[in-house]
Amino acid sequence: MGNKNRFYVDVMAVHKEVTGSCILNVIKFPDGTTKKVLIDCGLFQEPNYLELNKTLPFKPENIDYVIVTHNHVDHVGRLPLLVKNGYRGKIYTSMDTSILIRHALADSYKVIRQKAKLANEKCLYSEKDV
């Protein structure tokens, strides 16, 4: 019979640090279709966070869906970077989180912009990406 009637998920945690939650799930269905679902896309907050936050280890345009667990910046802080780099799909979360995310990302952008300026670095994303 082989694997043709099997459903399986490959889970790739794309971080080794405590913050920066970002888990890519590749779901393979019995009919052969594949969906890529990203669970969270958070900011790293470790000492070398500016460097850690600059890149995503996957192509955002290849992600089918994003699911956000809650609005803490270490779970949502790189969503604007995801959008800036090509993600155009929907972001799924609870109603309460969807309201709070807007405020969290606006505040986060101000902090990121200021820290980038102090470090003489380019900001990760622009205000329009928020």
Annotate each PLM feature.
Residues N5-D10, K36:
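Extreme N-terminal starter segment of soluble prokaryotic enzymes
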Residues G2, V26-F29:
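N-terminal glutamine amidotransferase
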Residues K4-R6, E61-N62:
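A short, charged/proline- and glycine-enriched loop
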Residues G20-V26:
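Short beta-strand scaffold segments in enzyme catalytic cores
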Residues H15, K28-V68, H72-R88, T93, ...:
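Pre-active-site segment of Zn-dependent metallo-hydrolases
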